[in-house]
C-alpha cells in the first residue's frame, strides 16, 4: 500500500499507473475526495496516509519543507519516503534533517508529466538518487520501474541539479521569454523556428509556480541563466561590430 500526499496533476498521473498494482491512500489539503475516488485511489487523513509502507510526496517543492515537519512524527518507523521534485539537492537535505533516521529515503525526478506520459511510460526516463535505502529495496524498486517501461538513471542530487538547470530550468526560461516576446506561428517560417515554438508547447501547460520553483530551489539555475544571457549579449556585440 502507498500513501500519496498531494493530488495535483502529477499526483493524478501517479495514481493512474500505480493503482494497477497498489492500494493508494491520498491526502490532499483541499477537499478532493470525489476526484480522488474517481482517479482510482482512496481519500484519507494525513495520519492514515503516513502509516503506509511507502509515502510518495507529490506537493510543490515550495510546500515540501513544511510538509516534512508535519509528517515526521506520523510516519511508520520503517517507511520509505519518495519525493518527485524537479530539483534534488534541497529536498534531500530537508528529508535528512526533518525525518526520523529509521525512515528510508529515495529522491526521484520523473522526467515526464501528465502530457507526455498520458498513454504510456515506455521509454520515459526517471532519475533516482538513493539517499538512505537498503540495497535490496532499491533494486526491487528499479526492477518495478523498468517493468513499467521506464528508463532508470541513477545519479547524485548535485549532478542531477547541475544538468537539470540547463535541460529543464533554462529551457523553461527560454520558453517563457519566447512567450513574452510574442512568438507565434508564421506563414513564412523555418524548421528551426518551428522547433523554437515547440518549446512554448512544452511549457504552456506548466504553472508559474513550477517555473519559479525550479529556478528558486535549484542552486545551479541562476548561474545557467547568467551564462546564457552573457552568451546572448556577446552575440549582439558581435553583430553590432560587423554591421
Model-based region annotation:
Residues 1-45:
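NAD(P)+-binding Rossmann beta1-loop-alpha1 motif at the extreme N-terminus of oxidoreductases
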Residues 42-47, 153-157:
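Short acidic-hydrophobic, aromatic-tinged amphipathic segments that line or gate anion-handling sites
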Residues 46-75:
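Rossmann-like NAD(P)-binding element
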Residues 58-60, 85, 130:
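Glycine-rich, N-terminal phosphate-binding loop of Rossmann-like dinucleotide-binding domains
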Residues 74-94:
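ADP-ribose/adenylate-binding Rossmann-like module
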Residues 87, 91, 95-151:
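Rossmann-fold dinucleotide-binding core
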Residues 154-243:
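An accessory alpha-helical subdomain
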Amino acid at each position: 500500500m502507498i500513501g500519496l500526499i498531494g493530488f495535483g496533476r502529477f499526483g493524478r498521473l501517479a495514481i493512474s499507473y500505480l493503482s494497477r498494482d497498489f492500494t493508494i491512500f491520498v491526502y490532499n489539503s483541499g477537499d478532493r475526495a470525489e476526484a480522488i475516488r474517481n482517479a482510482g485511489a482512496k481519500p484519507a487523513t494525513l495520519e492514515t496516509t503516513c502509516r503506509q509502507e511507502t509515502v510518495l510526496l507529490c506537493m510543490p517543492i515550495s510546500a515540501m519543507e513544511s510538509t516534512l515537519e508535519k509528517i515526521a512524527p506520523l510516519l511508520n518507523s520503517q517507511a520509505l519516503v519518495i519525493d518527485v521534485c524537479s530539483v534534488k539537492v534541497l529536498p534531500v537535505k530537508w528529508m535528512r534533517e526533518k525525518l526520523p533516521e529509521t525512515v528510508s529515503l529515495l529522491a526521484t525526478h520523473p522526467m515526464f508529466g501528465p502530457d507526455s506520459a498520458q498513454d504510456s511510460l515506455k521509454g520515459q526516463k526517471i532519475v533516482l538518487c538513493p539517499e538512505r535505502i537498503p540495497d535490496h529495496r532499491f533494486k526491487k524498486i528499479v526492477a518495478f520501474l523498468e517493468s513499467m517501461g521506464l528508463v532508470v538513471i541513477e545519479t547524485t542530487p548535485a549532478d542531477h541539479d547541475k544538468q537539470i538547470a540547463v535541460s529543464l530550468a533554462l529551457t523553461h526560461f527560454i520558453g517563457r521569454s519566447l512567450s513574452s516576446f510574442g512568438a507565434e506561428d508564421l506563414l513564412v517560417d523555418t524548421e528551426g523556428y518551428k522547433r523554437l515554438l515547440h518549446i512554448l508547447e512544452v511549457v504552456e501547460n506548466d504553472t508559474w509556480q513550477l517555473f519559479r520553483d525550479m529556478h528558486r530551489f535549484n542552486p545551479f539555475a541562476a548561474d545557467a541563466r547568467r551564462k546564457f544571457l552573457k552568451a546572448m549579449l556577446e552575440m549582439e556585440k558581435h553583430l553590432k561590430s560587423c554591421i
